[in-house]
Amino acid sequence: MPDVKERAARKEPGAAESASRESRGGNTRESASSARGTDRVGSTVARARPPSPQGPRRGAVKTAPRGPVGHGGLRTGPTSRCPQPSARAKLPSVTRGAPLPPSPGKGHLGGTPSSHRLGMTERVHDASKLDCQLEERSLSSSSLKGKVKDTMPSDFWEHLNEQLSAVPPDFSCALELLKEIKEILLSLLLPRQSRLKNEIEEALDMEFLQQQADRGDLNVSYLSKYILNMMVLLCAPIRDEAVQRLENISDPVRLLRGIFQVLGQMKMDMVNYTIQSLQPQLQEHSVQFERAQFQERLNKEPRLLNHTTKWLTQAATQLIAPSASSSDLQDCSSSAGPSPSDVAVPEPLSPAMVLSQGFLNLLTWDPENEEFPETLVADRPRLQELESQQSQLTILASVLLVASSFSDSGLFSSPQFVDKLKQITKSLVEDFNSRPEEVMQSVSEQVVEEVHQGLESMGLAALSSENTASLVGQLQNIAKKENCVRSVIDQRIHLFLKCCFVLGVQRSLLDLPGGLTLIEAELAELGQKFVSLTHHNQQVFAPYYTEILKTLISPAQTLATKGGSL
């Protein structure tokens, strides 16, 4: 049986293949194989997918000779006797439930109930907000790692090991798993790859495998190697290393488990490419569709923008008469182009400044205030998520700032120590809103312990008893809303988000104010989400915002600013 490296070497050479291979590197997906369409995702995705400039990497290649597997079509075997997972580890179809909306001017929705129109608007709105890059760490319930943990617990794999080790062996669980793996392999193929589809269906013919299992001679190791070789043909360059690592696993159960996990990553690669391919179309259609639907509602309800007008009026008033706490805005500056501190100058006003202040106010919105802007109702769940994320970052940055002020500078110059402390703090502050005092007590204990261990491991001077007690007290005081450190950090994060809205995320990261440098990566993620949400909303409702802001900003102020319009 040829190993993975030999199998990969048998790929047919060609210009497109060479170009794809030469272009690999990092996490960038440059191969069309990373964008494999599936029948499950639908032919719409395949048609919408632009051809890769690198050409097809895999799929039109010859595979190694198959072993003694049977012939025949795909059939299901008898009911498995193995423990059934609560839900199969299948990734949902990207396009189902989120079709490209029709042009708003063609009247496809004319005569339908208003509830149906609102539902369609929300579906289009949600489809346009799909993240361009899904990752395992952000998909605890949708990633393969999460699926294996949730739906195929360790007792399944233990039971599979017991069955294969029995005399005679029981292959019922193995057959179920092979059937699942076969379906995933088929889902990674493009419709035109009929030859590979026929080969997979022939090599993993469930009826023939059931016959082998009944005779007690099902070769699980051989089938695993065949699946591994097929994965070499289908995976994106970024997954080559993971696939080749599986070659060194001799235990059949561990190998099957590894295969199942990597196949899930390959499906995620395909989902990401599909999202990236459809994103521009979804956004373009969404802006037109949402605006047309809102205008239709506005024609029937002339007072529909009352809450939106009040929201923007409050934002403009805040900028004209800023609070004393706004003096901290000067901490944000940038050497590239206009500095973020320029953004915070209260006069002259600009539409962009008022709108950015309005968006920031939504992150501190009183849940009992029912006068939520009508133009942002669909975005309210996402704004609440951003508010929660921003609040946790405020606590995290406050903890790091206080801890660093009591420690030797060399300790917080260690990325390993900072990362460890951040992970510990993040896990503890998840329940901060429900029990702040209790959470901060746990945080103070853990942080003090980590600081002591870090200082000792680096040969630095230990904290005195007095400093330790002071550190614990200041960390626990972060639980209070009026805590000075917490208030300053909160203001600076809000300023950073305002800078992101006006200047962009990258320019806003160039010169972070004190206390935020240790959470730069987390701020970049938060800023990108905030900008993505607010800019889409601005694209949809810019005509309405412009008309409202004309009544709030004098023409002289508008002319005095470069951002005179949205």
From Swiss-Prot:
It is found in: Membrane; Cell projection, Cilium, Flagellum; Cytoplasmic vesicle, Secretory vesicle, Acrosome. The gene is Tcp11. Testis-specific. Expressed in mature epididymal spermatozoa (at protein level). Plays a role in the process of sperm capacitation and acrosome reactions. Probable receptor for the putative fertilization-promoting peptide (FPP) at the sperm membrane that may modulate the activity of the adenylyl cyclase cAMP pathway. The modification Phosphoserine is found at S103. InterPro entries: Tcp11. Residues 326-336 have a biased composition (Low complexity). Residues 25-36 have a biased composition (Polar residues). It is a single-pass membrane protein. Residues 1-115, 326-347 are annotated as: Disordered. Constitutively phosphorylated on serine, threonine and tyrosine residues within the head and tail regions of noncapacitated spermatozoa. Phosphorylation on tyrosine residues increases upon sperm capacitation within the acrosomal region in a protein kinase A (PKA)-dependent signaling pathway. Residues 1-24 have a biased composition (Basic and acidic residues). GO terms for cellular component: acrosomal vesicle; membrane; sperm flagellum; sperm midpiece. GO terms for biological process: adenylate cyclase-activating G protein-coupled receptor signaling pathway; cell differentiation; negative regulation of exocytosis; protein kinase A signaling; regulation of sperm capacitation; spermatogenesis. Belongs to the TCP11 family. Found in a complex at least composed of MROH2B isoform 2, PRKACA isoform 2 and TCP11. Interacts with MROH2B isoform 2. Interacts with PRKACA isoform 2. Interacts with ODF1 (via leucine zipper motif). This is T-complex protein 11. The chain crosses the membrane at residues 393-412. Keywords: Cell projection, Cilium, Cytoplasmic vesicle, Developmental protein, Differentiation, Flagellum, Membrane, Phosphoprotein, Spermatogenesis, Transmembrane, Transmembrane helix. It comes from the Eukaryota.
